[in-house]
UniProtKB/Swiss-Prot annotation:
Cu(+) 3 binds at residues 267, 270. The lineage of its organism: Eukaryota, Metazoa, Chordata, Craniata, Vertebrata. It is an enzyme of class 7 (translocase). It comes from the Eukaryota. Cu(+) 2 binds at residues 153, 156. It comes from Rattus norvegicus (Rat). Its EC number is 7.2.2.8. This is Copper-transporting ATPase 2. Keywords: ATP-binding, Biological rhythms, Copper, Copper transport, Endosome, Golgi apparatus, Ion transport, Magnesium, Membrane, Metal-binding, Nucleotide-binding, Phosphoprotein, Repeat, Translocase, Transmembrane, Transmembrane helix, Transport. Each HMA domain can bind a copper ion, they are tightly packed and closely interact with each other. Wild-type ATP7B can usually be loaded with an average 5.5 copper atoms per molecule. The gene is Atp7b. Cu(+) 1 binds at residues 68, 71.
Length: 1451
């Protein structure tokens, strides 16, 4: 067909189809070459390149053997993937398949063969084929993007384009040299992406598939004819093309936004289907579909497309069940090109009205910040946006009046200490639209509300720090992107909240999720508004180090499922194909034999429960395959069992051998020949040798079997260790002894020869014992990890919420099936199953596993919760943010594992020595053999002199060989490794026994040998330096004793606090009972506890307590109370709490009382007030007291040349206060478990040996990483198992004792080795016959290992005389040096910051700020500063694991 005729035909066809679809046409004269549907992939598309004639054929295949729809699905999936197949439809009822295919690529017979390969019978049905010419269209095309590496110039680009363009099925190809990629449009029934990739690889380049676009399918709408029109080319140019002739203003005149209601969508695939297909229609500029709202926003050119056309196109999309509703006023219009304007389209989406209130605020200091006020208001329900101007003293609040009122907003601000008034004339009604407009109050000042509008462009309303914004981007924008940022410098959850809250205020940030332990932030953002480098800069502006991570892929989920109901291979194929087509699943493999499926997925898109649901929807049953939780841990049960068996077997037969050896050493007045055991049973065989032979044989082949196995493995790797030396010595000794004994019996010798049967039992007994104990110690590793994992909850209560957060359904879900984004209910006393954020409810959480602090932390909506922590009080709903291996607890487990794996074993000195000793002895033995043979043949008289022939029938040569061999074997046996092998284990066994007697449990020889090298000891604070529980330090009576006695106050306060579960309340109750000398208290009613403030109740029946006078001392400075006060029963109204609690109840706190509280708070103590019957009558100072021996231990370690440091998760000021009392100069405060590990590694990298002393779960990674981990005996099981040394008596002076004992033990080991070496150095030359000329020859007793072994054992037993230095000795050594340090003498490092935080002089404002920071065990005080910004900043840096700002923990 001529080119001109072809264009005319296309034009006429396009006009016909457009007239049917009410699509307005435009003159061809305005046309110019533009691209359609492919502009977004980087190349132009034109009519000439998209349409060509193609011959298609439809055939019918008869199929026998199909039994279910799974078979139908398998056949359709298999055949549709073949080249040349356009479509296939299989009918189970008719037993046939209708296939549309390209006959030039394959025929019907080949299709039948493919079906038969699947196990079915297939044949072509006659007379049912039809063929017709077809034009290629986008409905039959797909796009793939390939990564091409190796291109260097434009010639490479031309070569690839030229070759790929010639391939059958390739429609277009565009190669980019700068991007190193190729974008190819192809026909999937003719060629596949893998073929395209292979063709490029064959040309010498490296190619990989990046992504592919699904074929475009629009059902009855003829996209090919739509493409044939040039209306889009003429009227609606793509936004990316800057060369278009129309001006931007002209183009905007035709753009409109249409809101549509779409029913029938059920998953993300529907969204992608609509967006992908409709977005490529002529005139459609942009489309955004919301699955949650069931709406779509379409931006289109009203001059070339109509709303009716869009409705028809969407409803025609497969599978054909979409139902589109046009806005009011448009349903009845047909063919009209007029569409609602942007503003009118937005009004269709408007929800209920919102209001903007302008507040006038007075009392804000100029040097303060409005951030705390904004945070407080943003957390109120119904508040949508806040903008407060510090300069003008005004604030604009956008709120929903149906949820919150303006009076409530005013009251909330007034509660912060400011004066507020609401301007009624400025309260205006607004509607929150889905467009780009921002609500604005009438009459607002430019400095307030307009700033709010600018801060919220892009419709990013501020939802508060606890809100996770997962909403899609605005309709007018592009798809959101995600970046991952590595953040350094975070020390607590307050830092996390600070980063999340600050980033969410910026335009373009859609959601922020920060992980504290991994130091990583996941940020979703709108790339048109903000870019990832700017996000990193925003984080750095907050004072952290931030860097964009190159690998932006999220951690991939991996599960194994058990699937039942599969019967054949087609079932497997059906499941795999269904899973791989599911969005979010990256890999699926199903095994029919094992009925298991291995699935990898993106946890952000899909979860395990969703995957199981997908499988069950296609008719199968799936469940999670439970894996052994401890499968990855080292299991030493087998090794322990085998070495225990080896030791016991060697011991049973070795004890008699040792007895016989001692018997041989007993001096006797008679010659040895006359001894009973020396008598021959038969000629050449004595009683002693017979017993030795029997016992040694059992030991050699039963007890020594595992030594042979280890020696074989060592020799196979071409190395010689202690096992090789032991096996070599015992085997040669046994074989030599057996041979000479048999020879003596054969020759009927009068005297039984000297044998070495005593060597193997001695060696095997002690070495097997050492190996057994070694593997028992190693097994503790897996126990520590198992106990760590046991902290995790096994199930989670996942709930489904309805309107107003009403719980519609609860479901108990195994932890493995909990997904990110799940809403989880946690009841009081339960464990938080995952990391998350509180959605609803208030509670207190015990987070000691991460902070080490025993004080519970207040949790409210928006607060971060940690997996494994315990919910102490209220029931809460949380949203899961980190699950599986991303939780904080999993990160701690990972830290412990890495520390244990990286901790190189300390090689025994004897093992190192044996590597040289073994070959040396073999060489000496061989030289001895050769030298004596040479000497014998040169001068036989020398041999005959020292080795008289037992028989005259033996030849001269035989005598020489026997003598030379005997001396050679004697050298091997006298060089006994027994003494070397016993040198270390005997000293270690005695040393550990002595340590246990002195209250120190040392796990094996490695920590005992290493402790003497320690140069730095790092102490944890809570529970290690301190007792770990709060104690009352001072009880100050604020009223006259005559008015209210101390005993009465103690009785009332003790009774009130007896109803409290808070640790501070328990401490107060305990103190009151001790002071009153009683265990019974009065009664309390109307008890109320307000988290973060205090308690209130009514107390009665305390008269009986006052009548009882216990023998107890009163606090210093308080006189004896008067007797006989009040005879009748009284009821007291009691308030106990912080300053704010007293203010709320109308009590005034004088400056003297406030100063007294501040003095205690400056010391790291918590001060609370007591009011009885409306009168402020007492102040209680509570603190976690320092252990009395802590300062002495610190001074003693320093005197030994050991550096001492304090490392704690508590805030810097509490840590500094403790350090000054103990005498520690260097402090690391506000550190995480990972920081503790990093600090230990940092010191180890400097060549120092580090000991870590701790007691909590959060210390366990550092305990495992340290060269010697020392745990407090009263600490957690996890810490005890992870440590190398346990202080049973909870005495810090035992740290000094363990180092002292280690030095003694190592010194004894060295003495033992010297004794063993001396024995060998003297014995080997004698055994070799070097001193024969001077008459020194090998005597029988020297063949026994007892000479060296006994000396080594006796040397080790001298350790039993060790005595631990007593307290008086330590105090005498530290006399005159136990002085508290000043604050300036203590250097504090915060988190991973190596910069010293010196102690500045306290200004009046610092004292005020300090009150709101310092606390007991990460508790903060109650003084609410009116200078909100500075208090907030301080809280972010100093508070630990608090939600958004400093929160006070009170009784």
């Amino acid at each position: 067909m001529p080119e001109q005729e072809r264009k005319v035909t296309a034009k006429e066809a396009s006009r016909k189809i457009l007239s049917k679809l009410a699509l307005p046409t435009r003159p061809w004269g305005q046309s110019m070459k533009q691209s359609f549907a492919f502009d977004n992939v980087g190349y132009e598309g034109g009519l000439d390149s998209t349409c060509f004639i193609l011959q298609l054929t439809t055939g019918v295949v008869s199929i026998l053997g199909m039994t279910c729809h799974s078979c139908v699905k398998s056949i359709e999936d298999r055949i549709s993937s073949l080249k040349g197949i356009v479509s296939i439809k299989v009918s189970l009822e008719q037993g046939s398949a209708t296939v549309k295919y390209v006959p030039s690529v394959l025929n019907l017979q080949q299709i039948c063969l493919q079906i038969e390969d699947m196990g079915f019978e297939a044949s072509a049905a006659e007379g049912k084929a039809a063929s017709w010419p077809s034009r290629s269209s986008p409905a039959q095309e797909a796009v793939v993007k390939l990564r091409v590496e190796g291109m260097t110039c434009q010639s490479c680009v031309s070569s690839i384009e030229g070759k790929i363009r010639k391939l059958q099925g390739v429609v277009r190809v565009k190669v980019s040299l700068s991007n190193q990629e190729a974008v190819i449009t192809y026909q999937p029934y003719l060629i596949q992406p893998e073929d395209l990739r292979d063709h490029i690889c064959d040309m010498g380049f490296e190619a990989a598939i990046k992504n592919r676009t699904a074929p475009l399918r629009l059902g009855p709408i003829d996209i090919n004819k739509l493409e044939s029109t040039n209306l889009k080319r003429a009227a609606v140019p793509p936004i990316q093309n800057s060369n278009h002739l129309e001006t931007p203003g002209h183009q905007q005149n035709h753009l409109a936004t249409l809101p549509l209601r779409i029913d029938g969508m059920h998953c993300k695939s529907c969204v992608l289907n609509i967006e992908g297909n409709i977005g490529q229609l002529p005139g459609v500029q942009n489309i955004h579909v919301s699955l949650e709202n069931k709406t779509a926003q379409v931006q289109y050119d009203s001059s070339c497309i109509t709303p009716l056309f869009l409705q028809t196109a969407i409803e025609a999309l497969p599978p054909g069940y979409f139902k589109v509703s046009l806005p009011d006023g448009l349903e009845k219009e047909s063919g009209s090109s007029s569409v609602p304007s942007l503003g009118s389209s937005q009004r269709q989406q408007e929800p209920g009205p919102c209001r903007t209130a302008v507040l006038t605020i007075t009392g804000i200091p100029r040097d303060s910040s409005v951030q705390p006020m904004e945070d407080m208001l943003s957390q109120m329900k119904g508040v949508q946006q806040i903008d407060i101007s510090l300069a003008e003293g005004t604030g604009a609040v956008l709120y929903d009046p149906s949820v919150v009122s303006s009076d409530e907003l005013r009251t909330a601000v007034e509660d912060m200490g400011f004066e507020v008034s609401v301007n009624p004339e400025n309260i205006t009604t607004n509607r929150v639209s889905s467009g780009n407009s921002v609500p604005q109050a009438v009459g607002d000042s430019p400095g307030s509300v307009q700033n709010m509008a600018s801060d919220t462009r892009g419709l990013l309303t501020h939802q508060g720090p606890g809100y996770l914004s997962d909403s899609p981007p605005s309709p007018g924008g592009t798809a959101s992107q995600k970046c991952f940022v590595q953040i350094k410098g975070m020390t607590c959850a307050s830092c996390v909240s600070n980063i999340e809250r600050s980033l969410q205020r910026h335009a373009g940030i859609l959601s922020v999720l920060v992980a504290l332990m991994s130091g990583k932030a996941e940020v979703k953002y709108d790339p048109e508004v903000i870019q990832s480098p700017r996000i990193a800069q925003l984080i750095e502006d907050l004072g952290f180090e931030a860097a964009i991570m190159e690998d932006n892929t999220v951690s991939e989920g991996d599960i194994e499922l058990i699937i039942t109901g599969m019967t054949c291979a087609s079932c497997v194929h059906n499941i795999e194909s269904k899973l791989t087509r599911t969005n979010g699943i990256t890999y699926a493999s199903v095994a029919l034999a094992t009925s298991k499926a291995h699935v990898k997925f993106d946890p952000e898109i899909i979860g395990p429960r969703d995957i199981i649901k997908v499988i069950e929807e296609i008719g199968f049953h799936a469940s999670l395959a439970h894996r052994n939780p401890n499968a990855h841990h080292l299991d030493h049960k087998t090794e322990i069992k085998q070495w225990k068996k080896s030791f016991l077997c060697s011991l049973v037969f070795g004890i008699p051998v040792m007895g016989l050896m001692i018997y041989m050493l007993i001096p006797s007045s008679k010659p040895h020949e006359t001894m009973v055991l020396d008598h021959n049973i038969i000629p050449g065989l004595s009683v002693l040798n017979l017993i030795f032979f029997i016992l040694c044989t059992f030991v050699q082949f039963l007890g020594g079997w595992y030594f042979y196995v280890q020696a074989y493995k060592s020799l196979r790797h071409k190395s010689a260790n202690m096992d090789v030396l032991i096996v070599l010595a015992t085997t040669i000794a046994y074989a030599y002894s057996l041979v000479i004994l048999v020879v003596a019996i054969a020759e009927k010798a009068e005297k039984s020869p000297v044998t070495f049967f005593d060597t193997p039992p001695m060696l095997f007994v002690f070495i097997a014992l050492g190996r057994w104990l070694e593997h028992v110690a190693k097994s503790k590793t897996s126990e520590a990890l198992a106990k760590l994992m046991s902290l995790q909850a096994t199930e989670a209560t996942v709930v489904t919420l309805g309107e107003d957060n009403l719980i519609l359904r609860e479901e108990q879900v195994p932890m493995e099936l909990v997904q990110r984004g799940d809403i989880i209910k946690v009841v009081p006393g339960g464990k938080f199953p995952v990391d998350g954020k509180v959605l609803e409810g208030n509670t207190m959480a015990d987070e000691s596993l991460i902070t080490g602090e025993a004080m519970p932390v207040t949790k409210k909506p928006g607060s971060i919760v940690i997996a494994g922590s315990i919910n102490a009080h209220g029931s809460v709903l949380i949203k899961a943010t980190h699950v599986g291996n991303d939780t904080t607890l999993a990160q701690i487990v990972k830290l412990v594992e890495e520390a244990q794996m990286s901790k190189a074993p300390i090689q025994q000195l004897a093992d190192r020595f044996s590597g040289y000793f073994v070959p040396f002895i073999i060489i000496i033995s061989t030289l001895t053999l050769v030298v004596w043979i040479i000497i014998g043949f040169v001068d036989f008289g020398i041999v005959q002199k020292y080795f008289p022939s037992p028989s005259k029938h033996i030849s001269q040569t035989e005598v020489i060989i026997r003598f030379a061999f005997q001396t050679s074997i004697t050298v091997l046996c006298i060089a006994c490794p027994c003494s070397l092998g016993l040198a270390t284990p005997t000293a270690v066994m005695v040393g550990t026994g002595v340590a246990a007697q002195n209250g120190v449990l040392i796990k094996g020889g490695k920590p005992l040998e290493m402790a003497h090298k320690i140069k730095t000891v790092m102490f944890d604070k809570t529970g290690t330096i301190t007792h770990g529980v709060p104690r009352v330090m001072r009880f100050l009576l604020l009223v006259d004793v005559a008015t209210l006695s101390l005993r009465k106050v103690l009785a009332v306060v003790g009774t009130a606090e007896a109803s409290s579960e808070h640790p501070l309340g328990v401490a107060v109750t305990k103190y009151c009972k001790e002071e009153l000398g009683t265990e019974t208290l009065g009664y309390s009613t109307d008890f109320q506890a307000v988290p973060g403030c205090g308690i209130s109740c009514k107390v009665s029946n305390v008269e009986s307590i006052l009548a009882h006078r216990g023998p107890t001392a009163h606090p210093i400075g308080v006189g004896n109370p008067p007797i006989g006060e009040g005879t009748g029963p009284q009821t007291f109204s009691v308030l106990i709490g912080n300053r704010e609690w007293m203010r709320r109840n109308g009590l005034t706190i004088s400056s003297d009382i406030s100063d007294a509280m501040t003095d205690h708070e400056m010391k790291g103590q918590t001060a609370i007030l007591v009011a009885i019957d409306g009168v402020l009558c007492g102040m209680i100072a509570i603190a976690d007291a320092v252990k009395p021996e802590a300062a002495l231990a610190s001074i003693t370690l320093k005197s030994m040349g050991v550096d001492v440091a304090l490392i704690t998760g508590d805030n810097r000021k509490t840590a500094r206060a403790i350090a000054t009392q103990v005498g520690i100069n260097k402090v690391f405060a506000e550190v995480l478990p990972s920081h503790k590990v990093a600090k230990v590694q940092e010191l180890q990298n400097k060549g120092k040996k580090v000991a870590m002393v701790g007691d909590g779960v959060n210390d366990s990674p550092a305990l495992a990483q340290a060269d010697v981990g020392i745990a407090i005996g009263t600490g957690t099981d996890v810490a005890i198992d992870a440590a190398d040394v346990v202080l049973i008596r909870n005495d810090l002076l035992d740290v000094v004792a363990s180092i002292h004992l280690s030095k003694r033990t190592v010194r004894r080991i060295r003495v033992n080795l010297v004794l063993a070496l001396i024995y060998n150095m003297v014995g080997i030359p004698i055994a070799a016959g070097v001193f024969m000329p001077i008459g020194i020859v090998l005597q029988p007793w020297m063949g026994s290992a007892a000479a060296s072994s006994v000396s080594v054992v006796l040397s080790s037993l001298q350790l039993k005389c060790y005595r631990k230095p007593d307290l008086e000795r330590y105090e005498a050594q530290a006399h005159g040096r136990m002085k508290p340090l000043s604050a300036s003498q203590v250097s504090v490092h915060v988190g991973m910051d190596d910069r010293r935080r010196d102690s500045p002089r306290a200004t009046p404002w610092d004292q005020v700020s300090y009150v709101s920071q310092v606390s007991l065990s990460s508790l903060t005080s109650d003084r609410l500063s009116r200078h909100g910004g500075m208090a907030e900043d301080g809280g972010d840096k100093w508070s630990l694991l608090l939600s958004d700002r400093d929160e006070e923990q009170c009784i």
